Structures are given as structure tokens and as C-alpha cells.
Amino acid sequence: MKDCILITGGAGFIGSAISHLLHAEDNRTIVAIDNLHPQVHPKQRRPDDLHQDVELIVADICEPETWSRFMQEWRPSLVIHLAAETGTGQSLSEASRHTHVNVTGTARMLDAFAAAQHVPQRIVLTSSRAVYGEGVWQRPDGDLFQPGQRSKSMLDDAQWDFPNAVALPFCADITPPNPTSVYGATKLAQEHIINAWALSFGADVAILRLQNVYGAGQSLDNPYTGIVSLFSRLAKSGLSIPLYEDGLMRRDFVYISDVARAVLAASKEQAAVGRVYDIGFGSASTIKDLADEVARHYGAPAPHVCGKYRNGDVRHAGCDVAASLALGWKPEVTMAEGVARLCDWIDVRLSEGAV
């Protein structure tokens, strides 16, 4: 049996970026398991962005046979668990699909390790800010409360915010998880399942709750993820970017290179063990700010409020990254710089006919 670094979902956006950092800093063989789902990989082939030395196994993590074949050859000392269905809105209409992949797929992996009597030294899970739902809000008198999910009647009446309150940044040490989407619920389940298993078997665990990840290498075909790439393609076509709600909902956009560095740190640093860290830029921007930045880059018409909303979306999401500094990590790429990098990459991809 051979040692390796296992990256589940390793042919995706984040996995491909991590593969290059790991290859540069670690001499272990890197094995990626990915089913190359057509929603993410419409061409059904190995992505160009995945490091050429990564051994790619095209298989479904939900199938026991995938793991029996894998464990016949490999004994991973490090597991980076990325594989997941990630559509927040889509998870409400395809709940069984998201639950099957995110929960059952995780359990299948752990069952395979247990059956082979193998315990990885460390498991790094990329979780999501979706586990917080709307998070914690504060009233003018200082009272804190968790508002829960915005109701359909609120959204239909264009009552976007909770009245007389402001949303506070998410912080893993103090913000209780309270998911408002099926996707968020499955990511929280992943955290609980992996923590319970690792505590029983003696594996180290590090969990990163990622904010909105974007950047060069992001899928330009998946309509359910990647708002920055979607905006970029619209603006490049000379179209006005439509803004849902009033365009003033906030998100914390973190560039892919910063996320890849955070995952690498979580795989190595002792400070990561047994902790949950929030990974974002540390300041939230409105969707309108983002759309304005993209429109300026392409000289596109000003974005417009379209009056629509998306089920499952939270109003505001941002995080406090102070705790994550313990990993020796901090975000570096500003939104303006990140948007410019992404748009330049999209221009090259389109000129090459790659999308």
C-alpha cells in the first residue's frame, strides 16, 4: 500500500489550485477522486488547471466500489475533502442529490478507512459560510438575535432586511451555526460526521468555512455557482448585469489563490488541529459594488435592479478572519485586483475558444 495525499473533488476549481501548491511543497503522490460531473465539467475530460502530475481517478465518492478500489492501492496520510454539491438555491429543489453527495459520500469515505483499518494523520474539510445561515444580527440597544430564514412573504413584499438591526460578521468561535439552505445543512452535517469519526479513531481534523470563492479557473458553465464569473461574461457581452433584491446584499469575496494557501496551511500547521476557521477577505462588499467593478472593467452598461430574488439566499455574509491569522495566513488579493485577474483570464479563455 502506498502513501498519498487524497483530494476528493480534486479536479474542481479549488482542488486544481491546491494541486499546484501541494506539488511544489510536498513530495507525496497526489491522488484526486472526482466524478467530473457535467454541470461542472461539461467537456467530461481532465481539466487543464489540474497539475499534470496528479493521479486522477474518475469515480463517484458515493459508490462503495470507488473506495474499495482506491484502498486496494492507497493509504492516504492527508485527506483534503472538497467533494460536494455546492448550489445553495439548487439544493432546495434537489435536496436528495445534495444530501447524497455531501453526507453519504463523506460517510462512504470514512467507512472505507475504517474497513481498511486505516486512519489518515489529518483530514482537512472545506466547509462553507452557509452553515451560519443569516448568522447573528444586532439591534440598536445591543441585543443580539438569530433571525433565521427570511420568509417567502418577506421576499415577495421586497422586505430584504430584518428591521432595525444589522448583521454581524461570522466568527466560528462565537456565531452559532443555523443553516437556512439544504446545502448549508449538509455542510454542517459533514463537519459533525468527520469530527465524530476522527475523535473516535484518532485523526487530526481541520475545518475551513469558506466565504464566496472566485478567481481564474472558476467554471464558466455552471449556472449555480460563481457569481463573479457570471457577471464577467454578461459585462463582456455588453449587457447590463441584473441585480437581485436591491443589489445591496453583502458577500465576502475571497480569491482562489488565498483559499488555496489557507487549505495548505490547514494541512500543515498544528494550530489548525481541532479548530474551525473562517476563510474570507475579512470585509464584505455589496453585490452592486461587485457588479459596478466588473461593468467598469468592460465598459458595460450600469447594472440594474431586476426585482428578483433567489430562494435560500441569505441577506448578508461576511466573516472575521482574525482567528485565521494563527495559521500564518492572511488574505492578499483585493476585490478590485481579483476581478481584474478573473476578467483577464476569461478574456484569454474566450479568445482561445476554451469555453
State where each predicted segment sits:
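N-terminal Rossmann-like NAD(P)+-binding domain of SDR-like oxidoreductases, especially those catalyzing
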Residues: 1-211
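Short, solvent-exposed loop/helix junctions and linker helices
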Residues: 8, 100-103, 183-184, 221, ...
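Structural element of the ATP-grasp superfamily
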Residues: 109, 194, 231, 323-324
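Hydrophobic alpha-helix immediately C-terminal to the catalytic Tyr-X-X-X-Lys motif of short-chain
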Residues: 189, 193, 197, 227, ...
